[in-house]
Amino acid sequence: YDSAVTKMVTIHDMLSHHLGTKTFQGDFSFWDSKNSRHEIMYKMRYLKPSGTFRQDFGYCNSCFLTAGEIIPKVTGKPWEVYVYDSLIQPLGMEHTQTLGYGISRMPNAAKPHTTAFAGKLQLLPYDQVDNLGPAGSLLSCVSDLSKWLMMQLDSGRYNGKRIVPWEVLRTTRDMATIISSRKRGDSHFSGYGLGIFETDYHGKQIFWHTGGAFGFVTNTCFVPEENLGITILTNQDNQDFFELLRYQILNAYLKLPFENLSKTVLPGFLDEETREIKKIDGWKDRIKGNTPPLPLKSYTGQYENTLYGTITISEERNNPGNLLIKFNSHQNLLATLQYLDNDEWLLTYNNPAFGVFTTSFLTKNNTVTGIPIKASDFVEFDPYLFIKK
């Protein structure tokens, strides 16, 4: 997007999340999509930064993908093979895979769930994110990740064998992006190294990273001064438990007074969830068979967004009066549009994790010109504007 930044950007920048883009920007186009790694990297030129290069933090999965794609240029091995040969196999992580394809056929694999947008537990399909593999997309388990943590806590060694040079490991922990330098709670600063967050907590330096895919959120943390490593894997993505448990364990090991963090946070979480469900129920109550201001065929056709590509809107065959959106960059993603009133439609994805929202078509002189489309904040925060062809 910015030719000057293109000339200056380095691998270090891509691993530091300070290109100036927003957190998760572009992920609705890339996540669980049919885009190849090459196509994702090409489309990064359309990400308009809202922040300042090398100053503002914005988590960027496509940046990590790009950094990972440098590996085959240097080693001749794809990212997934190089990581397996250099890290997973030497650490004896026997139950860890670098590709997610085929997980649904595994006999002992956790299944993804969510309570988002419904207030009840729902089973989700597995994300297919091998196209974003270098952005931390591993299938693993607590026992295997414990070996990774032991390597981190022993300056790059595992069972006495050098896995990663200490100089390299130490460099990943050097703060590359300042997120905050002001006191907040029990922390005085927070920042990001190369693929790792860091902060102080009750006088100890803490390193951690969370992870997420639809139906899963994880938390891995280590405290070198205490020789402490923590990994938390959960298969329900709409909760704060995976964060609170980390602090509950940290507090216990640091011998801090006990505080029931769940008791403190849960009421506010439940109130927010109740408000969200009430809002969605209110939208659904407005579905009364009203007629939109233009004939249904006026809304059908192809719409385009420069970053995403094309969506196709058609009349839903089995539900007269409804419209169906096909997202052409995604394999199985669909959404229905049900007319409410006052030019407003209810948008509901067939994958519950993508969410439920309202939207309105843009028109000029009784001609449809476009439609804004929103997905869950878990994917991307901002809506996309699709222009009718």
Residue ranges: model-predicted function:
Residues 40-41, 97, 112-114, 174, ...:
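Alpha-helix boundary/capping detector
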Residues 72-85, 89, 123-389:
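Catalytic loop of the DD-peptidase/beta-lactamase superfamily, centered on the K-T-G motif
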Residues 1-61, 68, 75-78, 85, ...:
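Active-site-proximal loop and beta-strand segments within enzyme catalytic domains
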